[in-house]
Amino acid sequence: MSLKPTLLLILDGWGKAPAGPGNAVTLAGMPHLSSLLRQAGCTELACSGRAVGLPEGFMGNSEVGHMNIGAGRVVYQDMTRIDIAVERGELASNPALTGLFEAVRATGGRVHLMGLLSDGGVHSHIAHVEALALAARDAGVEVVVHAFLDGRDTAPTSGVGYVKRLASFLESNRAGRIGSLVGRYYAMDRDKRWDRNLLAWAMLTRGEGAPADDPVGAVEAAYAAGETDEFVKPRVVVEGGSPIGTIRDGDGVFFFNFRADRARQLSHMFVDGTFEHGDRGHVPSLAGFATMTSYDPALGLPVAFDKQPLDGTLGEVVANQGLRQLRIAETEKYAHVTYFLNCGREEPFPGEERRLLPSPRDVATYDLKPEMSAEAVTDTLLEEWAGGGYTLAVCNVANLDMVGHTGVIPAAVRACETVDACVRRIADAVLASGGRLVITADHGNAEELLDESGNPQTAHSMNRVPFTVVEQGRVHTFREGGVLGDIAPTILGLWGVPASAGMTGTSLITE
């Protein structure tokens, strides 16, 4: 099959924003890139929030951006998938939950919901706990919540607010009670410090911990003792001197964290029959144990939101056509044009070549060398383009993002100037060879280096990113309202190659 060679050039951190003192892109001018956009026309793509499968209002990032580009669809992250299920009222019918509820009803036990109680959105979200409690209540199951306090992805003493919110919610909806509380330092260790987990285990299964009459009082007592959320020692809610929420034989447990790394060890303690890292004492014979996402396939547990297969990616479609493709970047972004663009696949596809150029190691921060390795990446790219016989090449240029993260505006301007010079060389070579140049970004950064108060902003922006297609003798018209997941179908459409069945994105070109 003979198709026009196409280079997808991802200018990492290149967003669109009004000119201003914090916009390194407009301060630099980037005349060569600006000229291409004027000549070829362009559109802007959403690259944050729900547009890339993140929760609404969350900024995009390089990992998510490249996955969406490579997948040719919106790749919903775990938290967003759960949010959508809650919004649609689908959580209560999830098989992992209905199976657990049924098993607990059969034994006459209770369901214990355990996990990180906050709205940090890194490991869990309090809204998910509330929805789970309602689902269990509606299924006729008694609910006990075991709250692991955050203080790391949230303020150090914000935990009492989350406990108040949940306790009030459970009481007003008659949907259960909070039975115990402990800091994530103990319940969510991931570094094999099993002594910490064993303290949380003793609280959960034996009711060991400082007693309290109510959960809010338990947190306030911890604060009075000088403990902050992350480090709150086990606290148990008691009535008549006895813990109200101990996990017993015949009960069921649902671990509601959606991030796996800090939920894995405690889960092993409940289900691993060969546990050898300390004395657990009596291990409850549970009616069931289920988790929000897959923490470890070896556990063999029911999972509410298992990993989504991402077949039919851009790289796979190209490989299935028997075509050669190139991935190239410097170290800082190499994983993004390989592993993440291939949606979690480590090994190259047949016909996929990879070129890694080392990022500078002679500086501590890239504001001291804003050129990074862009010139070496460009040199190698053009050598490969001239002689490699590739139908698709994907190149990431890292400067605008990595220098943007330093917040040093003069350095970011220099990074933009460097990238602009590389774009000129790349465009000249691609067009002279009769190829096609697709230019875009994964998220913004360098265009917004000051916040509304004029203070340095080093995080990614929420801005849209430009998208254009440049080729000799043809000017395209682009639609509005696109997302990163539309890029792969656009490239395939230009070749006349059908998008894969899994690609839900649509072409950005109208004519």
Swiss-Prot record:
Catalytic activity: (2R)-2-phosphoglycerate = (2R)-3-phosphoglycerate
Record-listed substrate binding positions: 123, 152-153, 184, 190, 259-262, 333
Cofactor: Mn(2+)
Functional summary from the UniProt entry: Catalyzes the interconversion of 2-phosphoglycerate and 3-phosphoglycerate.
Protein name from the UniProt record: 2,3-bisphosphoglycerate-independent phosphoglycerate mutase
Top-rank lineage group of the source organism: Bacteria
Pathway assignment: Carbohydrate degradation; glycolysis; pyruvate from D-glyceraldehyde 3-phosphate: step 3/5
Its EC number(s): 5.4.2.12
Biological processes annotated in GO: glucose catabolic process; glycolytic process
Recorded GO CC terms: cytosol
CDD domains the record matches: iPGM
Binding site for Mn(2+) 1: 401, 405, 460
InterPro entries in UniProt: Alkaline_phosphatase_core_sf (IPR017850), BPG-indep_PGM_N (IPR011258), Metalloenzyme (IPR006124), PGAM_B_sf (IPR036646), Pgm_bpd_ind (IPR005995)
Catalytic EC class: isomerase
Pfam families, A to Z: iPGM_N (PF06415), Metalloenzyme (PF01676)
UniProt keywords, alphabetically: Glycolysis, Isomerase, Manganese, Metal-binding
Encoding gene (name): gpmI
Subunit structure: Monomer.
Catalytic center residues: 62 (phosphoserine intermediate)
Species, as recorded: Nitratidesulfovibrio vulgaris (strain ATCC 29579 / DSM 644 / CCUG 34227 / NCIMB 8303 / VKM B-1760 / Hildenborough)
GO molecular function, one term: phosphoglycerate mutase activity
Positions bound to Mn(2+) 2: 12, 62, 442-443
Keyword Isomerase: yes
